[in-house]
Structure formats: structure tokens, C-alpha cells
Amino acid sequence: MGKIIGIDLGTTNSCVAVMQGTKPTVIENSEGYRTTPSMVAFTKNGERLVGHAAKRQAITNAENTIFSIKRFMGRKFDEISNEKKIAPYKVTNVNGEARVEIGDKTYSPQEISAMILQKMKQTAEDFLGEKVTEAVITVPAYFNDAQRQATKDAGKIAGLEVKRIINEPTAASLSYGLDTKNENEKVAVFDLGGGTFDISILELGDGVFEVKSTDGDTHLGGDDFDQKIIDFLADEFKKQEGIDLRNDMMALQRLKEAAEKAKVELSSRTDTEINLPFITATQEGPKHLVVNLTRSKFEALCSDLFDSLIAPCKRAIKNSKLKTSEINEVVLVGGSTRIPKVQALVEELFGREPNRSVNPDEVVAVGAAIQGGVLSGDVSDVLLLDVTPLSLGIETLGGVMTKLIEANTTIPSKKQEVFSTAADNQTSVEVHVLQGERPMASDNKTLGRFHLGDIPPAPRGVPQIEVAFDIDSNGILHVSAKDKATGKEQSIRIEASGKLNDAEIEKMKEDAKTHAAEDEKRKEAIDLKNSADALIFSTEKQLGELGDKVPADKKTQLEEALEKLKEAHKSENVETIKPAMDELNTIWNDVASTMYQTPSGDTPPSEPETGASEESKGGDKTQGDGEVDAEYEVIDGNDKDK
């Protein structure tokens, strides 16, 4: 049985881990980083870049660089008005669903997420040296059914069988509590990531991880803090220069990067200077942005965001039926928990200093890997009892939502209830499935609708319709309705907004495979071109060094073959490069044989380097994303993005 990897599919960054024996291991990507930016870019020549390669070119290719796609997952177009405003890429409405438009193509959020998942899958395969087909993927605890389905679809498109969808705070608790299985602890996991906020209260003991309650906000995260700084910088520049930088996509992307950097710096410093030279230009000349931002100003700008963290925490504590004093630890998860004001707020809310023993960027992926180990049998004596974050029910007479499964019910769970008709001789009923906490159906999230027909005519209230809700361990809902008189039953697996049908998923899977093949072909072409480049260089060098020692006829042959290879190299045609390289290498072999037989005693030339190992020869290094980095010398190996 192959390994089940754990993937934290984040709004800003993603991370992949796997169990190695009894220990979880976070896997470095091809660039040497333990987390990968959740970014996808499409270049002018049709190349697709994922992760750091996409991030590096985001400023100059803002309209074709997609980030924070997680915020669009499983949501209708009319639900994403705020997110759409701040995205430099184009988000369009296709039959009520949100789609990203790049050139003449549109992509669903699931497809973009699948590209990120493919990168994580490839990272794991490179590390393990074997194919990976199964994964545990994490989602925010407060994700609804549609968002969970969309995440599962993304996994399918990426070629992964999603063995389990697991809540991020629950995954973090697995990582935190794996070594404390014999202690009875009540733990709050405070998870503030790039795009979402979750708070979960759990009880850990004897290998059982039981979620008591969960709450959160799927529209609150690091992106929102960045946006506050972006708006502040844009407003300041507009006051000074009369130019709104928000109308310039390239300038806006530079503001975004500067805002993120400033936010990070203000976690360890009380002030920072934001200096963006040549941010724009007018007839008078170039304009520069220089603004000093203090930590206190940042906290004032984001005061409403900090306030928004309080209510979910209070609700989660109340629903857990625990007192704040009974909670033993508060574990911080997500990069945004590094903000000092957030840490102070947590300490004030829970009356204790937060626990910083886990890596907030990696702990969720580690927990997902542990759950993968549980499912594959590599990890024993661990039982995970999660909950559904929101109540589930149906619309009944008068437009009221009648709850069948309450929020914070342990999953998997099944509940049945008997309903009847609202009118005389009614022969069919519509089951309108809802998720949320509001009393009126119209104020809650519609998950789906289906009909049960052929009900025998009878007076109102006589037919007995049994509605059953079955929520699985992924938090995904299945609903059935049965006429108890006839035994006729209708059931559905909820297919809500953003849910792709099987045909769409299969098509996207094929597209993903095609892209993977294209990426591999492009990589092979780059490797071959680099090898040709190395052969041209070494041939010219050796011809110069050997001079007249090479027989005249052989020298002519070498020069002719060299010119042929140069022409092929310029054309970038793989079909002509390979034969030209083979011809030149064959002539070099003849030259070496001839010179071995010369009486002069000179050392014959070695066969020129063909670029088979570019790194050792100073050739170009090709990254997994198909991007070629220029030759460079590392000055400070520690200078990495955090």
C-alpha cells in the first residue's frame, strides 16, 4: 500500500507532509522551501507556473497570476463581490459560478487548486521516489458542504483519491497532541491563516481527540490585514500625488508584496519604512512611494479585524460547555498568529499565554499526515472525533428552517425525522436542504434541492415522509426522503454551488494530465538545450586550447558540426538539436581516437561535457515548474522567504 500524504491547501501557502515510520516529515519542494505559495501563473508563451516560480513574476504578470483561490472555492459568483474587487486577475460569471478568465480560457477554482495540489503531489513523489495517489487534505473548520465538496473535486482533478477531508484546527491538534496521548487536556486551537479564521475547542486524552465545539469566519485572514495596508498606502499616495495606484495592476501587485512584507516586519519591529521607487510615472517624471508605518498605526488600521476575532472565540467556548479556566492550552496555528496584537488578544480572551510550541506554518500538514498514517495503519491508538461546524436542516411550512443535525454534532452522524404534506392531495414534495444557524430558510445557505414524487393523494398531514440526513467523516452530506406508505425513496449526495459533475471532473483530470505531460516535455526540451549549450561551450574551448594539434580534416569536420549545432540551438527545435549533438560527439570520439595514436605523447582531448549534469558544470538549472533560473552564485544561503 502506498503512502497517504497530508496536504495543507492554504490560502497563501500550502504544505505537504508524510509519515516516515512513526514520525511525520514536512517535505521540501524542488526550490528547497518547506511551504509553497498557493499561486498559479500563465505566461505569454502558454507556460504554467506554480508556487515560487509564479510568485517571482507576479508583479510583471499581475493579470495572469492567480492567488487566494481558496476564497472562491464552492461559492457562487454573487457571493464573492468583495474578493473579486481586490483580485488583479479577471473573475467572471459562468452560469452563476465564479470562474477565473485567463486569455480565451476560463478555469474553475477547483482546477486552479488542483494545479497547486499537483505541485504538492509532485513534491511528495520526488521525496518518496514512488507514485502518490492518496491524500488527506485539510480545510477550514468553518467550510460549508459546498466548499468541502469543491476541495474534494480539486483533489480528484489533481489525480488524488482524497481519503479524508479534515478540519485544519483538528489536524493541528493531532500534531500537537500526538506526544501527549496519555494526558487529559482541554485545548483551544486558534487558527488564523491567510484567508480564514477557525477556533476549535478539543479534549485530548488516551489517544482520543474529541472536538467539543468549533466556530470561525471564512472571510477573515492575513489577506485582509494586507488589504488594510494596501488601502492605507494607496490613499496616502493619492493625497500626495493625486494618483490612485489601485487602477494600475502592476503597481497594485507591488503594493500587495510591500504590504505583506511590512506586516511581517511589524511582528518583530515597532515601525517599518515602505519604499517603492518608480511606482508610477507622469509627464513630470517618475513617482516614488515612501511611507513610514508604525505598529500602532497598523493596529489602528486593522482594529475592526481584531475585533472580529473575539465573537467566534466566545461562541466556541460557550458551545464547548467549558469555562475558560478549564482550558489548559491555547495553540496558535497559521502565519497571521505571529502578529503581536493577535497574541495579546488571545492571552486576554483565554487568560493564559498562548502555546507557541508548534510551527504555525507546518503544523496543519503534519496533522494531516498523521491522519493519513491512521488511515493506512501506520499510526495506531489514535481516534479522531470531529464535529460539523454548522447546523443542517430543511425548509418547512412558512419558510422556516427545521434543523435535523445541530452545529457541533460529532461526525459521522445520521438523523431521521418524519414530515408531511402542506396541502390536500399533494403528490410530490420538494426537499430544500439548508446549512446555517438562522431561523428563516432564506437567510441560510442552500446546499441543494430534490423532489420526491408519486405520493398517493391524501389529505394534508396524512402522508408520512421520512427525511434522513447522513453526514460522513469528511463533513459531506447525503440526504434521502422516503414515502413510508409506498416505500418509494429518493436520495442525493448534495451537489451545491460550485459542485462539478463527474463529466466536468473527468475532463479537468484529462486536462491536468495533458498539462503535466506538456510540462515534462518542456522540461526535457530545456534540459536538452542546456546540454547543447554546454557542448558548444566546451567544443569552442577545446578547439582553442588544442589548436593545430587537431588534424586539419578533423578540425574542419568539428567546426562544421559545431555550426550545425549552433543553428539547431538557435531554432530551439528538439528534433534537430539531438542529432546535431550526436554528430558532434561522434566526431570528437574520432578525434580522441586519432590523437591517442599520435607519437607526440600529448594528452588527447577528453570528450566535451554534454551538460548531463548541469549543476556541476555551471549550466542552467531547470526547476520543476518548467522555469529556467539564470546562472547565479549563492552569497547567503539563509536568505529565504519566510
UniProtKB/Swiss-Prot annotation:
Looking at the record, which segments are called Disordered?
A: 593-642
Acidic residues composition-biased segments: 626-636
Listed Pfam families: HSP70
Biased composition annotated in UniProt, kind: Polar residues: 593-603
Keyword annotations: ATP-binding, Chaperone, Nucleotide-binding, Phosphoprotein, Stress response
The record ties this protein, via Gene3D superfamilies, to:
1.20.1270.10, 3.30.420.40, Actin, Chain A, domain 4 (3.90.640.10), Substrate Binding Domain Of DNAk, Chain A, domain 1 (2.60.34.10)
Can you tell me where the transmembrane regions are? none
| Acyltransferase is among the record's keywords | no
Fetch the CDD domains from UniProt: ASKHA_NBD_HSP70_DnaK-like
- Expression induction: By stress conditions e.g. heat shock.
GO molecular-function annotation terms? ATP binding; ATP-dependent protein folding chaperone; unfolded protein binding
Q: Where do Basic and acidic residues bias regions lie?
A: 614-624
Location of Phosphothreonine modifications? 196
What role does this protein play?
Acts as a chaperone.
User: According to its UniProt record, which protein family does this protein belong to?
Assistant: Belongs to the heat shock protein 70 family.
Spell out the PANTHER family in the cross-references.
Answer: HEAT SHOCK PROTEIN 70KDA
Q: What is this protein called?
A: Chaperone protein DnaK
Q: What is the originating organism of this protein?
A: Chlorobium phaeobacteroides (strain BS1)
